[in-house]
Amino acid sequence: MFLLMASVLPIRQAPMNGTPISASAAAGVDGVGAAVALAAATKKSAAAAAAVAEMAKTLTVDTDDAFAGLLELAADDDAEGLRRALERAPPAAADEAGLWYGRRKVLEHRTPLMVAATYGSLAVLRLLLSLPSVDVNRRCGSDGTTALHCAASGGSPSCVEAVKLLLAAGADADATDASGYRPADVISVPPKMFDAKIALQDLLGCPKAGHGVLRVVTRAANSMLSPVSSPTAEDARSPSAAVMMTTKFADLPRVVTSEKKEYPVDPSLPDIKNSIYASDEFRMYSFKIRPCSRAYSHDWTECPFVHPGENARRRDPRKYHYSCVPCPDFRKGVCRRGDMCEYAHGVFECWLHPAQYRTRLCKDGTSCNRRVCFFAHTTDELRPLYVSTGSAVPSPRASATATMEMAAAMGLMPGSPSSVSAVMSPFTPPMSPSGNGMPPSLGWQQPNVPTLHLPGSSLQSSRLRTSLSARDMPADDYSLMQDIDSQLINDLCYSRIGSSTGNHTSRTKSLNPSNLDDLFSAEMVSSPRYSNADQGGMFSPSHKAAFLNQFQQQQQALLSPINTVFSPKSVDNQQLPSHSSLLQASLGISSPGRMSPRCVESGSPMNSHLAAALAQREKQQQTMRSLSSRDLGPSAARASGVVGSPLSSSWSKWGSPSGTPDWGVNGEELGKLRRSSSFELRSGGDDPDLSWVHTLVKESPPEKQVTTAESINSVGPSPLMPPSVSNGEGPSLNAPLDGHDQAAVIGALLEQMQLDQHIGSLAT
């Protein structure tokens, strides 16, 4: 209408050259103009409509927005929404490609099938694969990928099922992308889904040479995996092959693997199964304890030494006192004591502990192929198991008692460092130095290290232990006697004497009767070998005098080269054999003739050495007996002065706590008590005096000795007797000695010990 009026208006306003127009003429003119204007408007509207229709055919803006919605529905696995959208869209929209923001952070052309395969949308995959317009092997995008490539590299939890659906629909497992990679070459799954990776490799076929990845399976959780055959390219395209592969994958057990770094072969690494590295000593005290000195990277599992941050690290059982019992807090990872913990941390500390290592037989025996085995493979490799503790480490009381027995067999007494070093092996140190009867000075000085209290440490010593004899000692041990005897006497006289059971925690240096009573009664009565009633009663007050008298007779027979007859006034003759056997058992000596060279077996390796040592001592004794009293006069006088010294005053108070003699014991017995050989004072010197050993093996027991004045005169004057006794001018031998004679006897005895020492040093 606007055009029509615009065309008519000029007509109405046009002048007629000054001539007026009539009404009829004007009406005719208006009708013609309207018709012309209407025709022109119709033509223009038709052209506009045609242009709009043409634009509608080529316009894709609205169509792209609708296709983006299809890709979103495919990623969300919304199969129902995708079905409704495809019904409104053209049939070809299901296989069209659109822009999708992918993993590489760029827009790539992807079809709804590719997006569904990437995210594992199984319902959408089934819907799209059912449409005839969808091509399962279509390539698109700059990378030329396919739906099978997207499913293999998507890493979705259901990627295996997605690959199975595509293979069942005819997807080509050998199709390559723009880079030449097959779907099997681009498999990508999270580390926790290693079983899915194995299944994808089996479904997509083995990788070709040059594009393969190394697969390492170290251990299986349930059972050993059987090899799974992969179908060929032709069989993989068939639905039957996919169904068979699905069944095989469902039957596969879950596999738990651990990656292990591969190291090149290092010939410089020691073989932990041979030579010294497989010995018990190294395994218990050095394996995974000593730090490794290699600065380069190598296999820790093949190296016997410890490395920084290694879980197999062990604490040295010689420095850290812990037991073989596993620590319950360490298993939970909350042990706060660290290296100070008294329990084992880890498997290596538990089974390589000296108390447990190789105390049991290995179930595989000699066919065991373990790199480090904690068990013995033959009976010869079994380490001894102590009954008292139930482990390979003896109890502190058992070790202390064994030390006393061996010291008694070697002529030593417990309490000196020498006696302990002579019986303990340098390669097997004890677990608890403070609890095995050694002096405190011998323990490791580590104030921050706790003391190990093994189970059974409070138990009594084992009944199965055996006392050592001379034939059980190596020949080299006899050379130690001369070096340690002087230290032994000093320790016995000046050091603190403590009980191995811990009952006597504090003792004075001066020995008094109360200390002696506690020492002998506590140690002997608590011992299992004296646990019966008849022998336990011997230490009652009523039997004390008889026991001390018999003890003096035994010591006199050991020390004095002159056979002296004592009057058994307060000793019951029927109790002598029992007391004698008891005393011999307490000293660890089975019989007086046990250490005689004649009693040593001919097959013993120390036969000749022992015979030579005792023969030399016998020669020294003969030399001593040939000396006259005038040669020993000044020495005896000096010895008498020593007895009156303040040091000897404490010795003179051994008879009773008050210092006065007990009238139940006569003067002679009191003198013998003061001469007790177990606590004799040594005036000086470094070499030992073992003359009592020769007396023990050569002379008969005191019960069978028959001594006469003629035998005494034949021997000659003795330094053990005062001049009034040795020259026959004094009282008889059976008469009791007065105070001066007792002092002279003790002084002469000390002088003889000095002379024995001097002669022994000259002879050696």
Swiss-Prot record:
ANK repeats lie at residues 108-138, 143-175. One of its GO terms (molecular function) is zinc ion binding. Keywords: ANK repeat, DNA-binding, Metal-binding, Repeat, Zinc, Zinc-finger. One of its GO terms (biological process) is regulation of gene expression. The keyword Transport does not apply. It comes from the Eukaryota. SMART domains: ANK, ZnF_C3H1. Pfam families: Ank_2 (PF12796), zf-CCCH (PF00642), zf-CCCH_AtC3H23 (PF25512). Residues 705-716 have a biased composition (Polar residues). A zinc finger (C3H1-type) spans 321-348. Residues 616-665, 698-732 are annotated as: Disordered. PANTHER family: UNKEMPT FAMILY MEMBER (PTHR14493), ZINC FINGER CCCH DOMAIN-CONTAINING PROTEIN 24 (PTHR14493:SF153). This is Zinc finger CCCH domain-containing protein 24.
